[in-house]
Structures are given as structure tokens and as C-alpha cells.
Amino acid sequence: MTYTFLLFDLDHTLLDFDTAEEVALTQFLQDQGVQDIQAFKDYYKPMNQGLWKDLEQKKISKKDLINSRFAIAFSHFGREVDGEEMALCYQDYIRQQGQSFPGAEDLLAKLVERGYQLYGATNGVTAIQQGRLKQSTITPYFKDIFISEQLGTQKPEVAFYEKISNLIPGFTKEQALMIGDSLTADIAGGNAAGIDNVWYNPDHKENTSPVVPTYVVSDYQELLAILK
């Protein structure tokens, strides 16, 4: 199959969200006077991931997720806060974190050299993602970057891909490839939209879901081997 349009997920695929979150949370919690920062992180991170899964499954809204996660976490440790205010405060920290994985920039440079058109396709908060991308070194390789909050829809919804297809000149599904680490968002969404996909699986996770990717790779070199 010959592809032209490469749709890249960002977090956990190209951008190192775990490092970004670790740095931002530490700074944020220190400034909030939290005593046991590690205990807070140990509670917050899985809780936050669970909320994002709920959002994928349409159990909650993006606004509810953003405005409730810190209220829930602080409440767990006996402190009542304004969740919306804390969310805005945290944004100032996380949006400064543009760490990418080793080899990500080289991967994108080689793909551009090979004639591919690169587009970002990310679920996230616009202000946060735009800030992080501004701090990163990967942004210049993309023709455009589509953020779920801006589109008013998110992966894995078919509408997310339909909106992207209308915004990319000359786009056809047959020439497109979705690349990402999430079976439930990137791969399930690609399948539903009729777009071939690559499951980026660097941790060699077992796929126990009914979602079947077109390709599976564990590192960037394997991806380059597919996209010769």
C-alpha cells in the first residue's frame, strides 16, 4: 500500500507526556504547598487516566474532566479547591513541557525527506497542546496539527477523522495512515473511519482487545521500514 498522508498521534507516540507530566506536576504541587508530592502523584495519575478513558467512552465531557480532576485529587487528601481554578493554574506548568522521545525528530525528518505529508492528530486541551508544541522541536515537520478540542470531536469518533479529511488538501482515506500508541483511540478510530493504522507499541503490550491494527511496530526503525 502506498501512503501519502501520515496522521500522527502525539502523546506517548512522539511527545514524552509522562516526563512532561512528572515535571509539571512537581512544580505545580510544590507551589501549591503539597507536603507529600509523591503520594499525590500516585493517586492523581491513574485517576486522571481513568477520566480520559471515560471521555473516550463518552461517559463524561471534556469540560467535566478538566474542571474536576484536581478537585477530586485535592479532596482525596482533605483539601477543597476550585477545580477550574486549579486546572488553569496547572496549564501554566504543563504547557511549558515540550519533551519528545529520542529519535522522534529524526523519524519525522526522514519521513518528510521521503515525500510524506505529516499531520498531527491529538486528543487534548488546545492551550496545553499548543504550548507544548511550541516548546518542542517536532512542530516544523507537520503541515498542520489537529487538536480534538478545536475540532469539537475526538478520537476514536469517526467525526474526528471526517473533519480532518475535509481540512487536508487532496486527502483520501486510501492514502492515509494513522499512527499512534492507543488501541482504543488511534487504532479503533482509524478502523472505524476506514483508515489503515499503525499501533506503536514500544512496551510490547499484549493486545487482549478486539481491536486489530493494520500494522504493529515497537520502535521508529520498524515504522521507517514500513514507510520506505
PLM feature segments, named:
Residues M1-L6, A109-V112, V125-K228:
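Asp-based, Mg2+/Mn2+-dependent phosphohydrolase catalytic module
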Residues T2-P102:
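N-terminal helical cap/lid subdomain that shapes the substrate entry/recognition surface
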Residues T19-V23, P102-D106, G131, V158-A159:
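Generic recognition of short, well-ordered alpha-helical segments
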Residues G33-V34, G78-D82, L107, A159-F160, ...:
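A broad, low-specificity signal for short, low-complexity segments enriched in glycine/proline
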Residues R79, Y116, I195:
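Short glycine/serine/threonine/alanine-rich loop segments
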Residues G103-G115:
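Catalytic-core regions built around general acid/base machinery
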